[in-house]
Amino acid sequence: MNKDDDKEGLAMFSALIDGIKPITQNKRHFRTPLKTKQEIELKEQQLHANSYFSDTYQPLLPVQGPMRWLEEGIDSLELKRLRRGDYQPDLLLDLHGYRQSEAKLELAALIQACVKQQSLCCCIMHGYGSGILKQQVPMWLVQHPMVKAFHQAPKEWGGDAALLVLIDIGEQPHRR
């Protein structure tokens, strides 16, 4: 191509579009679709879960032995009862296959369900190995104000792949 071809092509293009006017806006305003009630509730749950569970917080948890934690001011006998399986979990949560964001939501929902149903103990199954959830779940549990203690579950409740969690449900009229 040379400059004469460019000039000729430009002249043809100008002749073709001569007299064409741009489209004018018809003043129609498009509204964004309203969020459904489910979307709003999901967003609130995520906000609620994120307010309790930070991924950057690193509590001091045992490196050796079974995973365990006891809130300050709680009798150490409670941890022993969890270890022996004296508490029977009323609610179970299986986190296999969940992403971290989904697991946080489910964990927050489980703790709320325990409080609502007056369930003192629950079991959280995070899986074997050294996966992300196995590392993150104890760190998240330590941060929640309703969690009094947790211990690696006995064999009948999942052993290394699960935690038994003691929940603060307020005043209990009787012991389970």
UniProtKB/Swiss-Prot annotation:
Pfam families referenced in this protein's UniProt entry, alphabetically: Smr
Enzyme class at the top of the EC tree: hydrolase
Domain of life where this protein originates: Bacteria
Domain named Smr: residues: 93-168
The keyword Transmembrane helix belongs to this UniProt entry's keyword annotation: no
InterPro entries: Smr_dom, Smr_dom_sf, SmrB-like
Keywords of the record: Endonuclease, Hydrolase, Nuclease, RNA-binding, rRNA-binding
EC number of the protein: 3.1.-.-
Keyword tRNA-binding set for record: no
Gene Ontology molecular functions: RNA endonuclease activity; rRNA binding
Cross-referenced PROSITE patterns: SMR
Signal peptide: none
GO biological process: rescue of stalled ribosome
Protein family (similarity comment): Belongs to the SmrB family.
PANTHER family named in the record: DNA ENDONUCLEASE SMRA-RELATED, UPF0115 PROTEIN YFCN
Subunit composition and interactions: Associates with collided ribosomes, but not with correctly translating polysomes.
Function: Acts as a ribosome collision sensor. Detects stalled/collided disomes (pairs of ribosomes where the leading ribosome is stalled and a second ribosome has collided with it) and endonucleolytically cleaves mRNA at the 5' boundary of the stalled ribosome. Stalled/collided disomes form a new interface (primarily via the 30S subunits) that binds SmrB. Cleaved mRNA becomes available for tmRNA ligation, leading to ribosomal subunit dissociation and rescue of stalled ribosomes.
Protein's recorded name: Ribosome rescue factor SmrB
Organism of derivation: Shewanella baltica (strain OS195)
Lineage, highest ranks first: Bacteria, Pseudomonadati, Pseudomonadota, Gammaproteobacteria, Alteromonadales
Gene: smrB
